[in-house]
Amino acid sequence: MYNPDASSVSTSNSDVGSLSSLLNKGLVDSGASVPTDFESLIASASAKYGVPESLIKAVIDTESGFDPNVVSSAGAKGLMQLMDGTAAGLGVSNAYDPAQNIDGGTKYLSLQLQRFGGEVKMALAAYNAGPGRVSSLGVSSDAELMSVLNRLPSETQAYISKVEKAQSKFRV
């Protein structure tokens, strides 16, 4: 039976930071389940904007691992990783507030779904890389997007598949 003493268990900040970094990059499955206090916020935003709950949860899981206090290296904040300018345009005054962040992030996701005719991969690419970048590709369907995916940043290419994988675990 394995019974380590306290001296053999690492608690260094670098080890914790490394795991956190891997989780944030999506290289380790966080196994995240939706904190119950977010469930009603997600259900409300889903009903308000017509975005499936499973997609909202998948974006949150991919973006922040359900950590409302996370900040990306680019400065995106909160559960759905809103940039300050985008957040302000969506009426979000505090991106760390889960209610505001989920409402604003879902509204933004809904706008991308509308802009790109309900094409989920295109909307996700726009959510991650910006709608202008996706529009500049001159494609009008997810199938066409996939044929020119290499023209998007590698982060965005990976983002689409990460969200789709996460969504499958949140579907009922």
Regions found by a protein language model. Name each.
Residues 71-92, 101-109, 125, 129-140, ...:
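Substrate-binding/active-site groove segments that recognize
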Residues 43, 50-67, 102-107, 123-130, ...:
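Short, functionally critical alpha-helical segments immediately adjacent to catalytic or ligand/cofactor-binding
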Residues 67-70, 147:
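A short, acidic/glycine-rich surface segment
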Residues 40, 44, 50, 96, ...:
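Amphipathic alpha-helical polymerization modules
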Residues 31-39, 48-49, 53, 72-76, ...:
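Solvent-exposed, acidic/flexible segments
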Residues 80, 131, 145-172:
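Cell-wall glycan
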Residues 27-31, 35-37, 41, 49, ...:
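Bacterial flagellar/type III secretion structural subunits and associated motility module proteins
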Residues 1-58, 171-172:
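Cell-wall glycan-active module
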